[in-house]
Structures are given as C-alpha cells and as structure tokens.
C-alpha cells in the first residue's frame, strides 16, 4: 500500500538506498548511484536545487503538487511549523524549499519583535455605544445629555444660580447673549436649563397658559377701551357741547345786563340792585384808583406849568425879570415823580386799549346776537 514500507526501492532511487523510514541524504546532493533519469555526468548530478529540479521531473513534481494541496487545505505561514512530506516524515526537499522561501539569503536570519501594546478596556464600537447611551441618559446631573438647552425665563433674583449639569462653554454663551440684551430684559430674564421633552413640554404648557392669560387681559382691555369710546361719544361729547352752548348763553345774558346798567347809569341811576353788585362796584372803584394813582391831577399841573413857562419866556424877551407868585423851582425829585406819573399814564393808556379791544369784541357779539334775534323774529 502507498505510504507503507516496501522491500522494493522507490522509483528513481538507487538500489543501495536504505529502507523506508530511514534517513537519506538531502535532495540534490551527490550520490554514489545516480537517480533514475539523471545523466551519468557527475557535474549535472551534483548541481544545485534548480538542476536537480529540472533533471528529475517525477521526483519534484509530486512534492510540489502535494504541497499545493496541503496549502489549499491548511494555510501555513512563515512562522508556523514545517509541513510534512507525503510519507509522514519531514522531507529535506520541503525543508530546503521552505528555507529558501523564508529567507532570500541562506545565511541571514529574520527576527521580528512587536512592541508591547496596552490592553484596550473597550473597543471603539463599545465606546461609541457608551457615548450614545450617555447622550440619551436623562439625568439632571448628566453633562453629556444631548437633549438640553438654556432658555431665558423670568426668574426671581434669589433663584438665579448656575445649574449643575451645564458646561462652562454653554453657560458662557448664554451669559453673553444675556449681556447683549437691554437693561430691562437683563433685570427680568435668567438662563434656565431645559432637559428632554418632558421639561420642554412643561415649558410649552406654561407658555400657553401665560399666552391665554395675556390674551384674556388684552380682550378685557379692548372691551374697556370700546366701552370708554362709546361713553365718550354718547355722554362726554354731548355734555361738552351743552356746556359750550350754556357758556355762550351766559355771555349773551351778561352783555344784556351790562347794556342795561350802562343805560341806567347814563340816566343817573347808580344804585346797586343787589349786594353782590355793590361789592363788585366797590372793587371796580378801587381798581380804578390804583390805575390812576397820583396822576389824577396831571392835566391841571400840566396847564400850570405851561402858563409859567410862557411867562418866563415873555420876560426874557422883554429883558425884564418877572416874578410869578406861586412859582417854585422844580427839583430832581419832582422830575422823577413826573416821570413815574407819565409812565403810569402810559400803562393806563395801554390797559384802556385792551379794554377797548374787549369792548369791540363784545360789540361784535352783540351785533351777532341782534342779527340772530332779528332772524328768529
């Protein structure tokens, strides 16, 4: 059977070779009896691996085919053990070929040594999964929670603190936004942490409640404004118009009374009709005295001064002195008093001008009233 020891020698081997399983010389080494099919020239029989390969096709083809089958069935590496031969023992041909495949140079020795690597506690996939778990872990103290944001809310001063789960970068961004607002907004608002959909839904619920209350207040205010507008149009404007008409009627009545009083005074009737009219007459008399002041006798004094000045002028022209009885020298104080009197008279004339203007306006009103009365009649 194939692979068992036989008494007959193998094909292509000399008859003097030892029995199967015993050590034999390496492949390609010179032998006393040349192999089958090799030339008798010793130069060819003692050649290297290439010469023996081409000189003995049968002996070299079988190990190559079987070696390829073994490589297909069980892949080997340069650092693994040496493959065995077809007969269960190590073949020197395979050993030599393997050494030639491992090292390009026969005398060189290839040594490799890997650097020590620290053991990885978690793989990259495990770390990614752990990061995703931490990002979705809803915990108030979890700084890596993905669903968190800082929103501005109206907060009392005693509750304005930094949340524990907020990073410094996020807090700095929120504070910079707060500093960019107006002073009134900075006093009212403060960053508030919102985590997850639960806090967001609660915040939306509160905002909806505030919006509803604000809308109710706006509706109430609008209804109050409409009510005030209706009251203004229905009550206030007519009241103002009635008061204006009443004022005009009172002015007409006052003008009529004044005309009656003037007519009675012209006829010599100066007696007051009522106590209030008597008091009013006294007040008017006092005001008239204050207006006239010391200039009541101004005209008489002016006439006396004119007479004295004419007499002095005539005496100077005649070259004789004229003594006027009662003539006195006018000192500076008298001139100052006269200037004051003239100034007061000027002011009194201005007041009289204003009185005349008012009288003219009253006359226009009276004329208009007479015209209306004539038209009514």
Curated annotation (Swiss-Prot):
UniProt keyword list: mRNA transport, Nuclear pore complex, Nucleus, Protein transport, Repeat, Translocation, Transport
- State the sequence repeat positions: 2-3, 11-12, 20-21, 27-28, 36-37, 49-50, 87-88
Classify the main location. nucleus
GO BP: any one term: mRNA transport
In residue numbers, the region (Disordered) covers 1-104
Fetch the InterPro entries from UniProt. Answer: Nup54/Nup57/Nup44 (IPR024864), Nup54_alpha-helical_dom (IPR025712)
Question: Nucleotidyltransferase: present as a keyword of the record?
Answer: no
Q: Which segments carry the region annotation 7 X 2 AA repeats of F-G?
A: 2-88
Q: Which domain of life is it from?
A: Eukaryota
Q: Where in the cell is it found?
A: Nucleus envelope; Nucleus, Nuclear pore complex
Bias-annotated ranges (Polar residues): 19-32
Ranges of compositional bias, category Low complexity: 1-18, 39-104
Pfam families recorded: Nup54 (PF13874)
- The answer to keyword Nuclease applying to this record is no
Annotated Gene Ontology cellular components are: nuclear envelope; nuclear pore; nucleolus
| Sequence similarity | Belongs to the NUP54 family.
Q: What is known of its domains?
A: Contains FG repeats mediating the translocation through the NPC by interacting with transport factors.
Q: Subunit structure, per the record?
A: Part of the nuclear pore complex (NPC). The NPC has an eight-fold symmetrical structure comprising a central transport channel and two rings, the cytoplasmic and nuclear rings, to which eight filaments are attached. The cytoplasmic filaments have loose ends, while the nuclear filaments are joined in a distal ring, forming a nuclear basket. NPCs are highly dynamic in configuration and composition, and can be devided in 3 subcomplexes, the NUP62 subcomplex, the NUP107-160 subcomplex and the NUP93 subcomplex, containing approximately 30 different nucleoporin proteins.
Task: Tell me what this protein is called.
Answer: Nuclear pore complex protein NUP54
Lineage at the top is: Eukaryota, Viridiplantae, Streptophyta, Embryophyta, Tracheophyta
